[in-house]
């Protein structure tokens, strides 16, 4: 009799767990949504002692564009991420977010960019301790007036994994800062994987900021964050093809186009060989850009000095041990 009671109790517990799992799966799929194409607001920022914003962009002048993936304020040198085979799923503390965001902004500020692009900037996330990280970015343009554009990349349902410290629900986006006036901006939706994989691929987009030039044409500035952790690199290639088609249309209309961001691609084409590391088992998506993807008229500019090779991204399965180059700080 006692044995039957134990079996019945265990059966009820298992049934309850099964119901919870089913309800969670229903919640995740029901909560999943895509933001879609939309116009974006341009915010003009200034302080009491700020130098007035510079006039329209001049042709023939030299301008500096920076790009940095903020990694939701988590990626200190010794941080490892669970999706890369590491151990951690969130920033370690509010203090860690503060220190990392200040460090990223200080580095970018030191470059004195005319245009600064940021990716994976959380506005409200479990993984980033619900800190609005956009508040840090204005310091990158300290001392001058500037325009700011924010595009929400994704608004994910609660990811109950890893079980001990779930990644949680996260709202994250991309931010563009400009010392020159931005006339208008828009969000463009990118294709993502289908089925269950779309829950890991999240939502993806790029923002388009239109900046007038003295010649009457526009500087069209693209800020992007392509897919990572997909089954292979095919979807990011498809996204890149869409971006290139958009840029080529602007180029043929006489406008000037620059795209920067986190490509989640091996931009050098042979990063493991260059940096003397073995490709990790989780690196199936960080593939070289297939030949012919970038059309004539557009050029891929990779920040790389062959005499002094420095990777733009480290693999995150171990604390700051292995490095690759995909023009991003994380994914």
Give residue ranges: language-model regions:
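Surface-exposed cleft-lining segments at the edges of enzyme active sites
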Residues: 88-93, 121-125, 190-198, 225-234
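Conserved small/polar residues in nucleotide/adenosyl-binding loops
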Residues: 323-329
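Beta-strand-turn-beta hairpins that frame and shape the catalytic cleft
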Residues: 55-65, 170, 174, 179-184, ...
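Catalytic metal-binding/acid-base residues of hydrolase active sites
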Residues: 71, 122, 154-155, 181, ...
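N-terminal, active-site-proximal structural segment of metallo-dependent hydrolase catalytic domains
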Residues: 2-143, 147-161, 165-171
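His/Asp/Glu-enriched short active-site or ligand-binding loop at hydrolase and phosphoryl-transfer sites
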Residues: 145-155, 280-321
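His/acidic metal-ligating clusters that form di-metal
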Residues: 205-222, 232-276
């Amino acid at each position: 009799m006692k044995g039957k009671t134990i079996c019945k109790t265990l059966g009820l517990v298992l049934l309850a767990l099964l119901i919870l799992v089913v309800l969670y799966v229903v919640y995740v799929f029901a909560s999943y949504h895509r933001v879609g194409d939309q116009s974006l607001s341009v915010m003009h920022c200034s302080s009491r002692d700020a130098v007035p914003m510079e006039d329209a962009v001049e042709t023939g002048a030299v301008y500096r564009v920076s790009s940095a993936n903020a990694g939701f304020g988590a990626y200190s040198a010794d941080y490892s991420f669970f999706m890369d085979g590491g151990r951690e799923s969130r920033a370690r503390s509010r203090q860690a977010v503060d220190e990392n965001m200040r460090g990223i902004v200080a580095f970018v500020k030191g470059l004195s960019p005319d245009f600064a692009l940021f990716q994976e900037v959380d506005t409200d996330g479990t993984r980033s301790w619900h800190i609005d990280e956009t508040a840090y970015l204005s310091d990158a343009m300290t001392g001058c007036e500037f325009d700011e554009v924010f595009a929400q990349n994704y608004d994910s349902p609660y990811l109950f994994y890893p079980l001990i410290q779930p990644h949680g629900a996260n709202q994250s986006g991309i931010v563009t800062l400009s010392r020159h006036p931005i006339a208008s901006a828009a969000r463009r939706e990118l294709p993502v994987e289908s089925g269950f994989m779309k829950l890991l691929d999240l939502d993806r987009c790029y923002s388009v900021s239109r900046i007038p030039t003295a010649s009457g044409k526009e500087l069209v500035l693209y800020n992007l964050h392509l897919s990572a952790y997909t089954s292979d690199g095919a979807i990011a290639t498809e996204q890149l093809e869409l971006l290139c088609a958009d840029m080529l249309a602007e180029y043929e209309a006489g406008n000037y186009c620059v795209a920067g961001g986190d490509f989640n691609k091996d931009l050098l084409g042979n990063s493991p060989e260059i940096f003397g590391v073995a490709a990790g088992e989780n690196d199936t998506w960080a593939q070289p850009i297939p030949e012919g993807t970038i059309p004539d008229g557009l050029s891929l500019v990779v920040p790389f000095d062959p005499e002094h090779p420095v990777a733009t991204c480290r693999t995150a399965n171990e604390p700051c041990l292995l490095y690759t180059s995909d023009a991003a700080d994380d994914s």
